[in-house]
């Protein structure tokens, strides 16, 4: 039982008509520690009990069993609970130290599978900074869901089909150099693609060539198939370098092409349900009752669209993974598309359509400017990660020039800084990226949290890594209590982040815990020889464990030394 549950349980004994869960939801955390650790507002009871909230608060407070609390006091319409710092703090520390790897875990998911569509770059194009958000938000959500006992399935739905590949093949036929492609695949292919698009203004026949090549690809022409497979293979090899740097694995790379032979079934099902209507030669589904535009399934030339392909993918994923939830971590600009996807599945009679969730996110800008991909102007993610690693290396050199594994730490700090900066922001907000700000060791940054963890590890090394087995642990003083209390809030933060698909809650939590620990460190002689030394070191160990765990949920490493 965590601290919030402890307070809710005490309230439930005097409010038996309300569940512990309902009471937990009503509890507030006072901003000022003088008002206690938890506050219970009584306004909502006034109508039912026909009494003023202040009177209700006083009457309830008199009935509450105060054992396990330092005190319970009334403040107007609120009942303020002060937890017993020494005993509750000791219990929190003991819980962390007993099983650090599983602290904060809970069985919210009951091993239910959750498919997560994330990253999904286009082959033969560089991964730009725009791909960072879907990739790291999706991965963090997967980690958080795993922590509450869901089974995440990371799906990289590659953009590996479409008329653009016909254009690329036409460009390669005209200007391609195999050796040049082998040397630098994605940038070279991107160069060809930009060239044919730029020159198509003066040479409209290039568009015709592109259509001809794509028609060959659709018809299974051996040369078109060979080029397509080669472009896909070299692109994926390049992407894997970035994914390895980010330390992200995928369970599936089934992209758009995988569903080429699975869309006819979708159209047949829609025909059987008599859902298709003709509109100017195209086939659509009327979604007026959902307040949505008609969903186009087949164009007048008989070709299918993204929605048809995504319907095929949705059916395949449900059959393959029997998911409890199916998430699509895609920019907010695609909200209408996923609303249509969900509505069409519902019209098809699939009750599991309510398991489909679009996880939108805001745009990313660089130094206050929008990032453009027109005419090849792409800010490449790999370049930004490498620049961040270099900057981290410089700062480590200044702070700790004798650090043994400086290159590895620089990579963990540099990459972690980029990931953390994205994830500390609420995902629906737009994010501005300024490299120099992102890699700072102070302020609301990833390196600040990593440095707090490394500081805790340094203290534990100096103390000879003591054993806490069998020790009676307590928490002494307000600053120590603020740290312990924050540690005790880890599980509820994880549960909320899982329910809201919001990794920023973990990012903000990690920053808050690091800040509380740094304040404690600044005002406490942790290694002083007295009867509280082991408890102080236990607090430091718990901070180290929980910061490492929180960073791991975000996909960020926690170096032991910096």
Swiss-Prot record:
Signal peptide: none annotated. GO terms for molecular function: arginine-tRNA ligase activity; ATP binding. Its EC number is 6.1.1.19. Keywords: Aminoacyl-tRNA synthetase, ATP-binding, Cytoplasm, Ligase, Nucleotide-binding, Protein biosynthesis. One of its GO terms (cellular component) is cytoplasm. Gene3D superfamilies: Arginyl tRNA synthetase N-terminal domain, HUPs, Isoleucyl-tRNA Synthetase, Domain 1. SUPFAM superfamilies: Anticodon-binding domain of a subclass of class I aminoacyl-tRNA synthetases, Arginyl-tRNA synthetase (ArgRS), N-terminal 'additional' domain, Nucleotidylyl transferase. Monomer. Belongs to the class-I aminoacyl-tRNA synthetase family. This is Arginine--tRNA ligase. It comes from Limosilactobacillus fermentum (strain NBRC 3956 / LMG 18251) (Lactobacillus fermentum).
